[in-house]
Swiss-Prot record:
Ranges for domain bHLH: 89-142
Keywords per UniProt: Acetylation, Activator, DNA-binding, Isopeptide bond, Nucleus, Phosphoprotein, Repeat, Transcription, Transcription regulation, Ubl conjugation
GO molecular function per UniProt: DNA-binding transcription factor activity; DNA-binding transcription factor activity, RNA polymerase II-specific; protein heterodimerization activity; protein homodimerization activity; RNA polymerase II cis-regulatory region sequence-specific DNA binding; sequence-specific DNA binding; sequence-specific double-stranded DNA binding
This protein's name: Aryl hydrocarbon receptor nuclear translocator
UniProt xrefs under PANTHER family: CIRCADIAN PROTEIN CLOCK/ARNT/BMAL/PAS
CDD domains reported for this sequence: bHLH-PAS_ARNT (cd18947), PAS (cd00130)
Gene: ARNT
Primary residence: nucleus
Species name: Bos taurus (Bovine)
Length: 790
């Protein structure tokens, strides 16, 4: 204050700095010198010598404020730097964490891709979403809930658990069993183990699966039941990378719960009785064929090969508690194998006694309307021995027995008329080894649905049994036919008017049969004897044809026939008793006694006529076809040997004009009886003369059948036979035969049409006397014909 008073200029010129600085509002006078003041503050020249406490205190107070601001500024910059470092470090840590997370997820996805079979099978690695989707599908397939509800309790509403189980086991043809993986104890086995392994359920309950398998398969079974890591895991080759690594992941996957098990082992087969009704046919066949490992020795168990397929499951299942007395209850959650066992039939040989179980061997064939094979099943090799190409293009009649050919033809014609209906016929089929097999053929036609035309005939041919085992003899064995070579059997389809000369010769040889009873049907003009020609010039033509056909130089057998002809056969008849325009033949040899018993023939030749009831259609047609063998074309003379030449006591001579007016079945100058002759007259005609034995029985029919016009000149003349052998029962009838020899015999017209062949008299004779009742014991060789009893 003293200084201020002493220096007034300074006091007025220089305002005090303290209030100005303190107030912060400088006056107008010092506005222009703000910079100076600032420089003065920087230099602080006047402050050094100012000892005033107030002023000094003011200057010191200003310096402290500036230093504190610098400290704050420096502290703030340090904080900002530290926060930036923290943020940078935080960002780096987050990136590292994300990178690690992505790496882990990639590793897990890769591992999942290796575990899912559908992913590992792809050529290129799929994306993550595809891997996850395939993994879900694979898990659903393992659980078996792909098309069911999420709780896994779905089952068909119309089936109970037992019905569903039986259907599954029947379809699989095996048995279901559940085995504990730790101990091998059998938890459950189905009742179908009995037909498969021949063992009851009681033998499996309470035992272990190790007791049921072969001792050599125990280690394999223990490996399949194991759910832990195997210490001796091998090494596997990764085909993708080409590297060899340990079996780690695959082993873990194989041992995880729900993994599949499929193995083959040998199981013990029991000896309990098998009820064939309670199981299907396939199980019964397998039961008979289960000796695939060879026959077991006495006292040793018998084993069969069983294929087991199943899954490893948790036992007990979730939500199921075992009873306290169960030995598995105190061991916690365990695993079990649920599998189905089936017999491995491929290791079993073919059964040799399958004929008692299986159906007869059969094959399917297709034919056209004519019966020619157009398709043959491959099973024909096992049935008849032929390859399919050996049958294609050939007619089925060619492989049929000659006696059954017409029956087969009729069946084919009938099945065409039935149009879709099944027709069955049984005949003898010639196999490749030349044996006759009884074959039953069920045939039906296939029609085009648009044109309604028959496309083809489908036949199911079943081999019944071999005909060699049949006790039924053929006709060739009963009539003692001589062996004439393989060409003796002719086709039954050809008629008598269609035979070629060579076939006529074979036909004539076929008719050389001893012991024929129905000689009234024989063509007497065709007997190869020395001809006696009368004044009729026209009658020498058929004789010349006969001599040229059966000349001695044509066949060596004819020379023997001609040499054995007795001289009395050429003996002529005086023209006083016979018209001049007729040719005569005579023969004196007797017919040898037939091997048939005499009591089978009755004195029925003179009985009242009986109308024949024609047999059934098939039998009648067969007889009609066989009868064609006995009626060759006119002019062909059969060769009769002395031992087989029949004896006739009368000669029937018919004029040429009369023969021309007759129907085709009445040969020129022949003793041919129509097909409507009663078989009752046949036994008598076998030994007595035809004019004396058979024709008297026809005189009573004169009212019904008038003689044909033009036959007045052709009356039947009779002459006593020389050396004729007569059956004893007919000796008493000779007088009546001779008394009726001069009667005019009227030929009975045939009941059939002219184009229809006459019945083979041998067959009619075997039918026997209709006035008596015959049974099959008297005719054991004719099982194909029904017994005729009236």
């Amino acid at each position: 204050m003293a200084a201020t008073t002493a220096n007034p200029e300074m006091t007025s010129d220089v305002p005090p700095l303290g209030p100005a600085i303190a107030s912060g509002n400088p006056g107008p006078g010092i506005q222009g010198g703000g910079a100076i003041v600032q420089r003065a503050i920087k230099r602080r020249p006047g402050l050094d010598f100012d000892d005033d406490g107030e002023g000094n205190s003011k200057f010191l107070r200003c310096d402290d404020d500036q230093m504190s601001n610098d400290k704050e500024r420096f502290a703030r910059s340090d904080d900002e730097q530290s926060s930036a470092d923290k943020e940078r470090l935080a960002r780096e840590n987050h990136s590292e964490i994300e990178r690690r997370r992505r790496n882990k997820m990639t590793a897990y996805i890769t591992e999942l891709s290796d575990m899912v079979p559908t992913c590992s099978a792809l050529a290129r690695k799929p994306d993550k979403l595809t891997i996850l989707r395939m993994a879900v599908s694979h898990m659903k397939s393992l659980r078996g809930t792909g098309n069911t509800s999420t709780d896994g309790t779905y089952k068909p509403s119309f089936l109970t658990d037992q019905e569903l189980k039986h259907l599954i086991l029947e379809a699989a043809d095996g048995f279901l069993f559940i085995v504990s993986c730790e101990t091998g104890r059998v938890v459950y086995v189905s009742d179908s183990v009995t037909p498969v392994l021949n063992q009851p359920q009681s033998e499996w309950f309470g035992s272990t699966l190790y007791d049921q398998v072969h001792p050599d398969d125990v280690d394999k079974l223990r490996e399949q039941l194991s759910t832990s890591e195997n210490a001796l895991t091998g090494r596997i080759l990764d085909l993708k990378t080409g590297t060899v690594k340990k079996e780690g992941q695959q082993s873990s996957m194989r041992m995880c719960m729900g993994s599949r098990r499929s193995f083959i082992c040998r199981m013990r087969c029991g000896n309990s009785s098998v009820d064939s009704v309670s199981m299907n046919r396939l199980s019964f066949v397998r039961n008979r064929c289960r000796n695939g490992l060879g026959s077991a020795k006495d006292g040793e168990p018998h084993f069969v090969v069983v294929h087991c397929t199943g899954y490893i499951k948790a036992w007990p299942p979730a939500g199921v508690s075992l009873p306290d007395d169960d030995p598995e209850a105190g061991q916690g959650s365990k695993f079990c194998l649920v599998a189905i066992g089936r017999l491995q039939v491929t290791s079993s040989p073919n059964c040799t006694d399958m004929s008692n179980v299986c159906q007869p061997t059969e094959f399917i064939s297709r034919h056209n309307i004519e019966g020619i094979f157009t398709f043959v099943d491959h099973r024909c090799v096992a049935t008849v021995g032929y390859q399919p190409q050996e049958l294609l293009g050939k007619n089925i009649v060619e492989f049929c027995h000659p006696e059954d050919q017409q029956l087969l033809r009729d069946s084919f014609q009938q099945v065409v008329k039935l149009k879709g209906q099944v027709l069955s016929v049984m005949f003898r089929f010639r196999s490749k080894n030349r044996e006759w097999l009884w074959v039953r053929t069920s045939s039906f036609t296939f029609q085009n649905p648009y044109s309604d035309e028959i496309e083809y005939i489908i036949c199911t041919n079943t081999n019944v049994k071999n005909s060699s085992q049949e006790p039924r003899p053929s006709l060739s064995n009963t009539i003692q036919r001589p062996q004439l070579g393989p060409t003796a059997n002719l086709s039954l389809e050809m008629g008598s008017g269609q035979l070629a000369p060579r076939q006529q010769q074979q036909q004539t040889e076929l008719d050389v049969v001893p012991g024929r009873d129905g000689l009234t049907s024989c063509n007497h003009s065709q007997v190869s004897v020395q001809p006696v020609t009368t004044t009729g010039p026209e009658h020498s033509k058929p004789l010349e044809k006969s001599e040229s056909l059966f000349a001695q130089d044509r066949d060596p057998r004819f020379s023997e026939i001609y040499s054995n002809i007795s001289t009395d056969q050429s003996k002529g008849i005086s023209s006083s008793t016979v018209p001049a325009t007729q040719q005569l033949f005579s023969q004196g040899n007797t017919f040898p006694p037939t091997p048939r018993p005499a009591e089978n023939f009755r004195n029925s030749g003179l009985a009242p006529p009986v109308t024949i009831v024609q047999p059934s259609t098939s039998a009648g047609q067969m007889l009609a076809q066989i009868s064609r063998h006995s009626n060759p074309t006119q002019g062909a003379a059969p060769a009769w040997t002395p031992s087989t030449r029949p004896g006739f006591s009368a000669q029937q001579v018919v004029t040429e004009a009369t023969a021309k007016t007759r129907s085709s079945q009445f040969g020129v100058g022949s003793f041919q009886t129509p097909s409507s002759f009663s078989p009752m007259s046949l036994p008598g005609a076998s030994t007595a003369s035809p004019g004396a034995a058979a024709y008297p029985s026809l005189t009573n029919r004169g009212s019904n059948f008038a003689p044909e016009t033009g036959q007045t000149a052709g009356q039947f003349q009779t002459r006593t036979a020389e050396g004729v052998g007569v059956w004893p029962q007919w000796q008493g009838q000779q007088s009546h035969h001779r008394s009726s020899s001069n009667e005019q015999h009227v030929q009975q017209p045939s009941a059939q049409q002219p184009g229809q062949p006459e019945v083979f008299q041998e067959m009619l004779s075997m039918l026997g006397d209709q006035s008596n009742s015959y049974n099959n014991e008297e005719f054991p060789d004719l099982t194909m014909f029904p017994s005729f009893s009236e």
